[in-house]
Amino acid sequence: MDKITLEQDKKGEHSILFLLLGGLAILAIITGLLTNYKNETLTCSKSKDICTVEKINLLNVKSTKNLVKYSDIATVGFLKQKVKGNKYAKGYSFYLLTFILKDNNQKEIFKSEYYEKTDIDKDIANLREQIENVNSDIVTLKREY
């Protein structure tokens, strides 16, 4: 059996520790790339009676989620919520774009927040105009980050 000095043993422990930390860092980066989205697109089809949200993450992988039936939508609105966080974030609000359904429930459209009231007002006006337009079959809204 070979004898290992104390210094060699400590070097081995350090290299294993660095490998583990490096592996965890790589996993964290991959998780971030897969779960952070660079854009979301709402698409509603009046003829198919469905609204879907397509999300594209930082690796350009698309995922699609069925949101609601188009016939259940009454109007478009927003939810105002307080920013949670440290003492510097107290008092600030963010807004979530929602569909107000015919049964008065709200269904969140995008997972990302709007921090400016003017931005969400523009998107609400755009969506309401498209929904009220009788001639168009498709309603779309794209949100990029």
Predicted feature descriptions by range:
Residues 5, 9-16, 52-115:
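Non-transmembrane, membrane-adjacent beta-strand/coil modules in membrane-associated proteins
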Residues 1-43, 144-145:
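Alpha-helical transmembrane spans
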Residues 2-5, 100-145:
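Terminal and domain-flanking low-complexity segments
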Residues 22-27, 45, 51, 66-70, ...:
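Activation on folded, globular domain regions of eukaryotic proteins
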Residues 33-37, 41-46, 81-90:
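DNA polymerase processivity clamps
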